Amino acid sequence: MKNKNLFPMLSVSEVNELLKQEEIFNFIGIEFEKLEKGYSRLKFNFNEKLTRIGGILHGGVVFSAVDYAGSYAVRTLDKVKDGVTAELKINFLKPMKEGPFTVEPRVISEGKRLVVVDISAYDGNSNLCAKALGTWVVYRETNSETQLSS
C-alpha cells in the first residue's frame, strides 16, 4: 500500500535534515520533535541573536516558528504534497524570555484546498505566550506521485 502523504515516509530526523537547507530554519535553531496527522511540535532554544531590546524573543522569530510548525502539520494530511501560507494571524500574549520554546499546531478544519490550523507557542516554563490561527492552500497528489516535484 502506498503512503497517502509525504511525511509518513520520512522520520522526524529526516525532516530536520531536509530543512537544514533553509537558512532561516538554521538561524533560529528549529528542531521538529513530532509529526503526526494534523499535528507537529517543534522546539528551539533561547539565543540572544533572536531577541529585541529588552531581552525578549523578537516577534518575527516567533511568527516564523509558528509558520514552520503550521506548515508541517498541514503536510502530514492525506495526499498533501505541499502547502503555502495564505493567511496567518498571531496574538502575542506574554513576552518569551526563557527557552526552550515550543510551538504546537493542530489542524482544526480541512477542506479540499484550504486547511485551517490553530497554533500555540510556549516558553520554557510552559506558559502560553502566543496564539495563532492560519490558513494554508494545499496541493494534493493527483496520481501515484509521492515526492515533491521541482
UniProtKB/Swiss-Prot annotation:
Gene3D superfamilies in the record: Hotdog Thioesterase (3.10.129.10)
Top EC class, one word: hydrolase
Keyword Protein biosynthesis applies: no
GO MF entry, a single one: fatty acyl-CoA hydrolase activity
Protein origin, superkingdom: Archaea
EC number: 3.1.2.-
Record's keyword terms, sorted: Hydrolase
Pfam name, any one: 4HBT
Family as reported in the entry's similarity comment: Belongs to the thioesterase PaaI family.
Name of the protein described by the UniProt record: Putative esterase SSO1253
Source organism (scientific name): Saccharolobus solfataricus (strain ATCC 35092 / DSM 1617 / JCM 11322 / P2)
